[in-house]
Structure formats: C-alpha cells, structure tokens
C-alpha cells in the first residue's frame, strides 16, 4: 500500500504512524495531536489483512480530504475514508474507490462518532462486501447533520441479507441532500450489473428526532431487495421531499 500527502507535508509523527496492530492499516493521530488528519491517500492492493483500512483516524480532530482505493486483496473488517472520535468534529470530503477485492464488514466514506459528515463519497466499481453495508456519510450518535454525501455503485456485490447502501446515515440528526446512484445509465438489464441483498437508502435517521429530507436514489440496473429514498426508523421524525428514480433493474420485494 502507499500512504502519501497530496498537497501539504504532514508532521513526520503523523505521516509515519502506520498501524499493523491486528493488521490495521492507516495513518492516525491516536495520540491526540493537534493536527487535523487530512490529505492522506491509501492505495491497497495486497493479499489479505485481518483488520481494517482507513485513510485517516483521529481521536480529537476533524478529518478531511482523505482517499482510500481498494484494488484487490481481502480485508477482514472495515474500510474508512476517514474516521473521527472527536466530539462535535466533522468528517468531510473523504472518498473511497473500490475497484476489486473482498471486504468483510462495512465501508464508510466519512465516519464521525458524534459530529457531522458532509460531502463524502464512495464509488464501488467491482469487488465484494461479505457482510453489512456501504455508507458515504455516517454519524454514529447524537443529532449531528449528514449532508451532501454520495454513493455510486456501478459493479460488485453486497452479499449480507441485512446489507444496505446509505447515502447518509445519522443517529438522530438532519439527513439531507444525500444521493445513491445504483447501476449504469443506459444499460437497464446488463450482465455484470451490481447486486445488493439488502436495501438502498438515500438518507436514513435511526432514532426519534431525526429528519430525512431531499435525499435521492436512482437505480439504472442491477438487483436490490428494497429502496427507500428517506426514512426515519424510530419514534417521531420527518421524512420529506425524498425521491426515487427507477430506470431499470430488479427490486425483489
């Protein structure tokens, strides 16, 4: 794999902190350094690791402008474009490009434990995800906003019966203007089109108080179980202005 800064020089202590504990791979400021985790690139084309891959990981700061490409190999756990545990911190403009390989668990473009996630993206062109889901923008807890994130899937497969594809996911915050683009335009029943054993969600709020607004799912081909442009799963919340565009493919339920 390669790890590099595309535009500015990272502190040596950050740029060289590549973890192999449990075979995790990625730069991290787990010592809570003051620097934001930004402008890293990971290109993974190895055989297999038991753990996860991330473009950046921080205990205390924003994470932005990081990119992860998975070309081949077997990753036992998760893939993150960037991940922050910092309270109120933002994951923004992080990207993942999947062109091959097998991933055991979920994929997150930008993951914030208790902040916000904006303008993150995942592009899946090939490969397999054995369990769980793909998220462009994800906030694990609290009412942080998740906006303007996008998942594009033109090939590959998500196999788990509980799998899902989420443009944006928040625990109880505003989930707005997120997008899922599934399949390839102009080829409604093409061989090799992507498949998802589970569900497509443009925007998803898991808890009461969440809002799912103006999210979009567009399906061109391939196969999925169900489609929801916007959903608030529990309690009291609003799902408004969400849209599904179905141009081809198969929705099995």
Where are these regions (language model features)?
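Surface-exposed loop/turn motifs in large extracellular/passenger domains
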Residues: 1-52, 57-78, 84-106, 112-133, ...
């Amino acid at each position: 794999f390669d790890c590099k800064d595309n535009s500015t020089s990272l502190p040596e202590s950050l740029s060289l902190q590549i973890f192999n504990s449990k075979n995790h791979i990625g730069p991290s400021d787990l010592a809570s350094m003051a620097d934001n985790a930004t402008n890293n690139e990971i290109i993974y084309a190895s055989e297999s690791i038991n753990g996860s891959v991330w473009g950046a990981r921080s205990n205390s700061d924003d994470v932005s402008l990081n990119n992860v490409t998975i070309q081949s190999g077997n990753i036992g756990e998760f893939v993150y474009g960037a991940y922050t545990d910092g309270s109120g911190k933002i994951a923004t403009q992080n990207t993942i490009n999947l062109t091959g390989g097998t991933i055991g668990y979920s994929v997150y473009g930008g993951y914030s434990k208790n902040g916000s996630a904006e303008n993150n993206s995942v592009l899946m062109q090939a490969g397999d995800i054995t369990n769980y889901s793909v998220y462009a923008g994800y906030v694990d807890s609290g009412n942080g906003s998740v906006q303007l994130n996008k998942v594009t899937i033109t090939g590959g497969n998500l196999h788990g019966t509980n799998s899902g594809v989420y443009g944006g996911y928040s625990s109880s915050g505003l989930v707005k203007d997120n997008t899922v683009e599934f399949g390839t335009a102009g080829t409604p029943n093409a061989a090799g089109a992507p498949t998802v054993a589970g569900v497509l969600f443009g925007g998803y709020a898991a808890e009461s108080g969440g809002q799912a607004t103006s999210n979009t799912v567009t399906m061109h081909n391939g196969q999925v179980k169900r489609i929801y442009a916007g959903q608030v799963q529990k309690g009291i919340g609003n799902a408004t202005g969400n849209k599904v565009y179905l141009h081809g493919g198969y929705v099995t339920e």
